[in-house]
Design a protein with these regions (language model features):
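Bergerat-fold GHKL ATPase/HATPase_c domain
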Residues: 1-58
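Short beta-strand element(s) in the Bergerat
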Residues: 25, 85-89, 138
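Conserved ATP-binding N-box helix of the HATPase_c
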Residues: 51-76
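Short beta-strand/loop element within the Bergerat-fold HATPase_c
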Residues: 75-85
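Glycine-rich/acidic phosphate-handling loop/turn and adjacent ATP-lid/helix
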Residues: 89-115
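Conserved post-beta-strand hinge residue in the HATPase_c
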Residues: 94, 117, 145-147
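Glycine-rich nucleotide-binding loop
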Residues: 97, 135-141
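Glycine-rich phosphate-binding loop
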Residues: 112-126
Length: 147
């Protein structure tokens, strides 16, 4: 799993995703946990194998819940892009700036509480993950490749 922060590497963000001409979709979401159902419905209707859908949803569920519970955002955008062997998911929000990739508090499995397994789990599920804050928007992109 690779990860990067800011502009240290070329970022796949919503504008480059859309400009690249790949199949992409965007859901405009309220900052409410009930909106997670829309993400779930969207992911599980995709033409992917069941295991990959579960993996993508688990990572998305963790990121979305963190945005809703801690960011103070008014809105969240969920972008999805699929290519031959990889899927890209991007969350964009207008909440307070927070880079989850800089989290130094890595927990051991036994230490996880009912609140979830956090960014550690997301990093394990993704083949690549990037964060940037541009024009007051948090942008977290995750790549899921065939392994």
């Amino acid at each position: 799993m690779k990860s990067s922060i800011g502009d240290k590497t070329e970022q796949l963000n919503e504008s480059t995703m859309l400009a690249a001409g790949h199949h992409s979709e965007c859901l405009e979401l309220s900052c409410e946990l009930s909106e997670l159902e829309r993400i779930r419905e969207y992911i599980f209707q995709l033409p992917l194998d069941s295991g990959k859908k579960k993996k993508i949803f688990l990572a998305c569920e963790e990121i979305f819940a963190n945005i809703v519970n801690y960011s103070g955002a008014d809105w969240i955008q969920f972008y999805y892009d699929s290519r031959e062997t990889e899927v890209h998911v991007i969350f964009s929000d207008n909440g307070k700036m927070f880079n989850p990739l800089e989290s130094k508090n890595e927990k051991e499995f036994e230490d996880f509480d009912a609140g979830g397994m956090g960014i550690s789990l997301v990093k394990e599920l993704c083949s690549d993950i990037h964060y940037s804050n541009t024009d007051g928007k948090n942008i977290l992109s995750m790549e899921f490749s065939e392994k």
